[in-house]
A protein has these predicted regions:
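General structural concept
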Residues: 80, 106-113
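Anion-binding and metal-coordination hotspots
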Residues: 97, 102, 116, 128-581
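Short amphipathic helix-turn modules centered on a small-residue break
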Residues: 62-68, 110-117
Length: 581
C-alpha cells in the first residue's frame, strides 16, 4: 500500500498521520450556509483568529513519538487534541463542557478547524488516552510536548512582532492541587482503607480482624470518634499495624502502585529503633512527605500564614519599556517547597537559550543567591532585585571591581584598595580614622593591632553588585517587575474559591501552566491585532501562505485544491490575512 508522504510521517517504521484536512474548506461547509453578515462576524471572532494563530501553527510532527511503530489505525488529529486542551483550560471548562462545545458551538468548531457540522475530531476516550500518552512520554523521557508547542508558538510570535527580549521579569505563584487536606492520623487511616481495596479475597479475610475497625467507615468518620488525647496512642497502634502489613505483603504486592504509596507513608512516618516501631516526631517530617494518596507529587509549604499543598509555577515574560506588548517566554513547574532562587538557577540557562539577547532580569528578593550570582555573571545577565532578602547591614561595605583580581572597598568614611590574602581578599582601613567613626562598634572589619581588616571573596562582591543594580538603572526601569503580578493573576483566574486547580499531579499542572501560557500570549497578540490591524498585513500574508506551502508539498493535496477552484490555492492567502486583520 502506498501512502502520501506529506500525510504520513515515517521514523523507521513509525506511521503517523498529520491533519491537513482543515486547509481545504468543504464546498457545503459552514461558510457556505451562513448569511454574509454572520460569516463576517464569525471571521472577526477571537476563535477564528485562534484557529489561524494557534491551531495552524501547532507542529504535529513533535507528537509522532507517541504513536505505534507499526501500521495501525490512524491517529486522531493531534492539532485538534492539543488545541482542545488549550481551549479547555483557557475557558475553565470541564471535559464534559468541552465536548458539548465541540458538538454544538459554532465558534469552538471554528477554533478547531472544523468546517462542517457532521464531523467530531475525537471521542472522550481518545482525548483521555492522548493525555495518558503525554504523561507516559514525560515519565520516560522528561520531555513535555505541550511545553514544546508553547516554545514553538512563542518563538514565532516574538519574531513576527519584533518584541525585544533583552529585558525580562520573573515571578512565581502557588498552584494548589485539587486534593483533600488530611491530618497525619487521617492520612495513615486512609492508606489502610486504600490498601484493603487491592488485597485479594484471601488476604482480606486474613487481615480482617485488624483492619475491620478502619474499613467499616471513612477515615474522617473514624477520626471523628477519637479524643485529642487518644491521638498519640492511636498513631503508635497504627505504626504496629503498618509494620505487620508491610512485612506480610511486601513480596506479593510490591508491583502495585497503591502498595508503593503505602510503603512511602510507612517509611515517612515511622522508624524502627531497637527492633521497636516508633512514630516520628512532627519535627522529623518535612514538606516533601505525602500530602494525599490522590496526588503523590504534591508538597507542603506555609507562606504568609497560609498552607499550600501542590506545586509552584514560575513565569518569565518580556519587559522592555519599548515593547507595545509583552509575551511569556518561559514557564516552569516544580514542588512548592523549592526555593525561588533554586528555580531561577535551573531555568535561567534555558531562558537564555530561547532568548539569547537577554541581559537584564528583574525579580523580587526571593530569587537572589550566591549560586545565581555566579550563573548570572557567567551568562552576562544583570540581575535586578526590587527587594533584598534578610536584614540590612548596619555598616555597608561597597566593593567595586577595578580590574581582574583588584577591588576597591568603600565604607562610610574610607575607600581603600584590596590586597590578595591566602584564600580571599582583604581591605585594610586606617585604625585612627576608624576610632572616630560612630559606627565602629558595628563594623564588619576586624580590629587588629595597627589596622582594621575586612575580608571578602568574589561572592561578596557579586552580592553587593546585585543589591546595587537597581540603583544604577534609570527611574523608568526600576519598577518593571510589579507588572508581572497581573500575569500571575491571569494564571490563577481559573482557580476555585479555595485557590485550587481542577487537576492533580505535577504533570497535569505542567500541562495546565503551559496551556494557559499559550492562551495568555494569544490573548495579548489578539488584542494587539485589533488595535494595530495595519501592522499585520505582511505577517498575516506570510501566515496565510503557509497552508499553500503545506499543500504544495503533496501533489495529491494540490490537485484536490486546483480541481475545486483553479484560483483558490493562490487567492486564499489574501483572504486569509484580510480576515485576520
Amino acid at each position: 500500500m502506498a501512502f502520501d508522504k506529506n500525510t504520513y510521517l515515517y521514523e523507521g517504521k513509525r506511521m503517523f498521520r498529520q491533519n491537513t484536512s482543515h486547509l481545504q474548506s468543504s464546498l457545503f461547509g459552514i461558510a457556505s450556509q451562513l448569511p454574509k453578515a454572520k460569516l463576517e462576524k464569525l471571521q472577526k471572532s477571537k476563535e477564528y483568529d485562534f484557529y489561524q494563530l494557534v491551531f495552524c501553527k501547532i507542529n504535529e510532527k513533535d507528537f509522532s513519538v507517541l504513536y505505534s511503530d507499526h501500521c495501525s489505525r490512524p491517529n486522531a488529529p493531534v492539532n485538534s487534541l492539543v488545541a482542545s486542551i488549550i481551549l479547555m483550560y483557557r475557558n475553565n471548562w470541564t471535559t464534559e463542557a468541552l465536548f458539548d462545545r465541540i458538538d454544538f458551538d459554532l465558534l469552538t468548531r471554528t477554533a478547531l478547524g472544523l468546517d462542517t457540522l457532521e464531523e467530531t475530531p475525537f471521542c472522550p476516550a481518545t482525548f483521555f488516552n492522548f493525555q495518558n500518552r503525554l504523561l507516559c512520554h514525560f515519565s520516560q523521557t522528561g520531555h513535555n510536548l505541550i511545553e514544546r508547542v508553547f516554545d514553538g508558538l512563542t518563538e514565532q510570535q516574538l519574531k513576527i512582532l519584533k518584541i525585544k527580549t533583552d529585558i525580562q521579569r520573573s515571578d512565581s505563584f502557588m498552584a494548589m492541587s485539587n486534593i483533600r487536606s488530611y491530618s497525619r492520623t487521617q492520612l495513615l487511616i486512609e492508606m489502610l482503607i486504600r490498601l484493603h481495596r487491592i488485597l485479594s479475597d484471601e488476604d482480606q479475610k486474613r487481615f480482617n480482624d485488624i483492619l475491620s475497625p478502619y474499613i467499616k467507615q471513612s477515615s474522617g468518620q473514624y477520626l471523628y470518634t477519637l479524643q485529642r488525647q487518644q491521638i498519640p496512642q492511636e498513631q503508635e497502634k497504627l505504626g504496629r499495624l503498618y509494620r505487620t502489613l508491610y512485612e506480610a505483603l511486601k513480596e506479593r504486592y510490591k508491583d502495585f502502585e497503591v502498595f508503593s504509596v503505602f510503603e512511602r507513608v510507612y517509611t515517612e512516618h515511622f522508624t524502627i529503633i531497637d527492633e521497636k516501631i516508633t512514630v516520628k516526631t512532627g519535627q522529623e517530617l518535612n514538606g516533601s512527605t505525602l500530602q494525599s494518596p490522590d496526588d503523590i507529587d504534591a508538597t507542603y509549604r506555609k507562606k504568609r500564614d497560609r498552607h499550600y499543598r501542590g506545586q509552584s509555577v514560575n513565569v518569565t515574560e518580556t519587559a522592555h519599556p519599548d515593547n507595545e506588548l509583552n509575551l511569556i517566554t518561559d514557564v516552569a513547574v516544580c514542588s512548592n517547597n523549592t526555593d525561588d532562587s533554586k528555580i531561577l538557577n535551573e531555568r535561567v540557562g534555558p531562558i537564555k537559550e530561547k532568548t539569547p539577547d537577554l541581559n537584564e532580569l528583574h525579580t523580587d528578593g526571593a530569587y537572589g543567591s550566591e549560586d545565581n550570582d555566579k550563573k548570572m555573571e557567567e551568562l552576562e545577565i544583570t540581575h535586578v532585585q526590587t527587594a533584598v532578602r534578610g536584614r540590612q547591614a548596619e555598616v555597608s561595605m561597597e566593593i567595586e571591581e577595578v580590574s581582574d583580581g583588584q577591588y576597591k572597598v568603600k565604607c562610610p568614611h574610607q575607600c581603600v584598595s584590596s590586597e590578595k590574602a591566602r584564600k580571599r581578599y582583604k581591605a585594610c582601613f586606617d585604625v585612627e580614622i576608624c576610632k572616630q567613626c560612630p559606627l565602629s562598634s558595628h563594623c564588619p572589619a576586624k580590629q587588629q593591632r595597627d589596622k582594621r581588616t575586612y575580608y571578602f571573596d568574589r561572592s561578596d562582591y557579586l552580592l553587593g553588585k546585585r543589591n546595587r543594580n537597581i540603583k544604577s538603572l534609570p527611574p523608568e526601569r526600576r519598577k518593571l517587575r510589579p507588572n508581572i503580578e497581573a500575569t500571575v493573576k491571569e494564571f490563577t483566574k481559573p482557580f476555585n474559591h479555595k485557590g485550587k486547580l481542577r487537576v492533580r499531579g505535577l504533570f497535569k499542572t505542567m500541562v495546565y501552566a503551559h496551556a494557559m501560557a499559550i492562551s495568555i500570549n494569544f490573548g495579548r497578540v489578539w488584542r494587539y491585532m485589533a488595535e494595530n490591524p495595519d501592522f499585520f498585513a505582511l505577517s498575516n500574508f506570510l501566515c496565510g501562505i503557509l497552508p499553500c506551502l503545506f499543500a504544495r508539498n503533496s501533489r495529491n493535496e494540490l490537485r484536490k485544491i486546483i480541481i475545486r477552484d483553479k484560483n483558490r490555492c493562490w487567492f486564499e492567502p489574501r483572504l486569509y490575512f484580510k480576515q485576520a486583520a
